[in-house]
Amino acid sequence: MDKKSSHPAGAARDILIELRNAGVYRDGRWLVRNVDLSVERGEIVTLIGQNGAGKSTAAKMALHILKPDEGMVSHKPGLRIGYVPQKINIDRTLPLSVERLMTLTGPLPRKEIDAALEAVGIAHLAKAETAHLSGGEFQRALMARALARKPDIMVLDEPVQGVDFSGEAALYELIARLRDDTSCGVLLISHDLHLVMAATDRVICLNGHVCCSGTPRDVTSSPEYVRLFGSRAVGPLAVYEHHHDHTHLPDGRVLYADGTTADPIAGSTMGPRGHCHVEDGHHHDHEHHHHEGGQPRA
């Protein structure tokens, strides 16, 4: 089912986080103002904008790290948040294994650690030192750390920093898959205007305020977006909408809405024409991206 049509007409919206006319005022100026956004369960919402546009400030309001100087921010009662910050103060030269990283902010049952690492594709790196991880592997470890506490919503601030291009594609696909598997909401903050569009349901473009919002196609065709990022930003985006017409089965096969299947391992495609098939690049997971030694790195 397409996540963007997962709410039948008249059904109650399960809003996890909502900002209404929210703004932060510091040192005689508004860092960001008039921000309206909401994230529902099972939805990926992406904040995009250039450096200094107010993306991280808006995210901190959403997390209740910053109190708005105007407007309001509300959370669903009992909301559990998994947060992956833009920067994390860990000295990666010190001995620190991936499984130890998972418990830095509190103990976790072994089965929860194992399940989270498996979900992000790095179960084989549980005992690896974080200093030896690639950028993509380290980001996956941080996502696993957030995921292990079973959040209702994950807030990811620039999650592909320090990751190469193929690793970025794999991470965005992972984020979409985690949403599909757990039905959590996702608030994604990024200045990356390319691959992120393929993994999101709704885009909110910031430049000190909300310039435009809507589906990826709506936003990239809006005059406000073009004025902010320039006409060159429209063509290279290669925006496509990832319709969720399939389910990932426990044995690894992909089941499409019409009942046909595809086997990612064998590389065979048995789905109808027009689906996102396993060989067309839309289902590249962690183990499909390798460095020259054959080890998965992103």
Swiss-Prot record:
Enzyme class, first EC level, given as a word: translocase
Localization: Cell inner membrane
Chain spans, region Disordered: 273-298
Pfam families reported for this sequence: ABC_tran
Binding site for ATP: 49-56
Principal place of residence: membrane
Domain ABC transporter: 17-232
Keywords: ATP-binding, Cell inner membrane, Cell membrane, Ion transport, Membrane, Nucleotide-binding, Translocase, Transport, Zinc, Zinc transport
CC per GO annotation: plasma membrane
Compositionally skewed regions (Basic and acidic residues) per UniProt: 276-298
Single GO MF descriptor: ATP hydrolysis activity
InterPro entries assigned: AAA+_ATPase (IPR003593), ABC_transporter-like_ATP-bd (IPR003439), ABC_transporter-like_CS (IPR017871), Metal_Ion_Import_ABC (IPR050153), P-loop_NTPase (IPR027417)
SMART domains associated with the record: AAA
Superkingdom of source: Bacteria
GO biological process: response to zinc ion
Reaction catalyzed: Zn(2+)(out) + ATP(in) + H2O(in) = Zn(2+)(in) + ADP(in) + phosphate(in) + H(+)(in)
Family in the record: Belongs to the ABC transporter superfamily. Zinc importer (TC 3.A.1.15.5) family.
Subunit organization: The complex is composed of two ATP-binding proteins (ZnuC), two transmembrane proteins (ZnuB) and a solute-binding protein (ZnuA).
Protein name per Swiss-Prot or TrEMBL: Zinc import ATP-binding protein ZnuC
Native organism: Brucella melitensis biotype 1 (strain ATCC 23456 / CCUG 17765 / NCTC 10094 / 16M)
Lineage of the species this protein comes from: Bacteria, Pseudomonadati, Pseudomonadota, Alphaproteobacteria, Hyphomicrobiales
Gene encoding the protein: znuC
